[in-house]
Amino acid sequence: MRTVKLIVCILFFAVCAFFSLGTLITGSSVITEGGIEKPRLITETGVNRNFGNEYEEYFSRAFAYRRYVVDAWSALRVNLLHEGNDQVVVGKNGYLFFADTIDAYTGLNPMTDEEIAKAADSLLALQTYANEHGAKFCFLPAPDKNTIFPENMPSRYMRAKTTDLDRLLAALDERGVTYSDPREALTAAKSEKIYYKTDTHWTPDGAELAFALTADKLGVQMFDTNTVGRVGEAIQGDLNTLLYPGQTLTESVMTADFSDSFIYTSAFSTPMDMVITSRGGGHGKALVFRDSFCNALLGLVSSTFSETQFERANPFRLDLLGTSKADYVIVEIAERNLRNLIGSDERIKEVID
């Protein structure tokens, strides 16, 4: 018995030593979550009294070969238990879902009636301000993937009969706020690849379906993607990356080739730039407030208008209407983030006050 205990102890300390000393090997430790720095016991101000907690956090994210350990653990959970991690839900037929969408899907922790009213009032204020400055307004909620593909969710999650999005759109109807609801169109097209299996977002084709409804609400002629060719596009699914940080797994789709239909006029770096401006061959100027779901719309929207300005800041900078002279205002936001609409009109309140 003592021999067994000794072997277990030796193995335990050997594993700890391997991962600890392994951090000294160049390339063995790669931090991908937030860029945390190695803490110091002695700082410019003296002894770091929080060194223990800081080093514990650092080591948990920087121990040697962490990515491969996480990959192996995820593979075991996915293949044996059909489970992901605290950020990823493993669904059916190869679908992965973002864990942050579960509350919206199940109705757990729903928005209160007061929150719904505040979100709707903010959108009404945004629309009123846009109209007063000569711009048409449309709100575009981007449905969570499990809203469109509930059949691929694990059976343990029960879908809510009435969602926050249902309630918000009803409140917008009462207030006369213009919106486009793409859920029906996306559901009807679900046999096509309109959402990525391994990513949170819709594909370019799914995004096009949603924007077609928005353009119709605004009375705009959407750019005809049939007039350009199609090219292959491979993305590294964000959900796959959260499950398997040590692997480079891609998912491919076909998308319209917008290379000759618009140009970026800002110093474009990535689709997640805080501000992006573009010039296309369409008519009118657009001001678009958006999140990551709009990444798949950059080319299409830019090609539809003569000038477009995309903004990621919230509260929304609708005060820019004073200088941009936009003809159209679009507010796009993911279904899971509807609470972020509350107070999104603060910037125009400052201008009015």
Language model region names:
Residues 1-353:
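Extracellular glycan-modifying ectodomains
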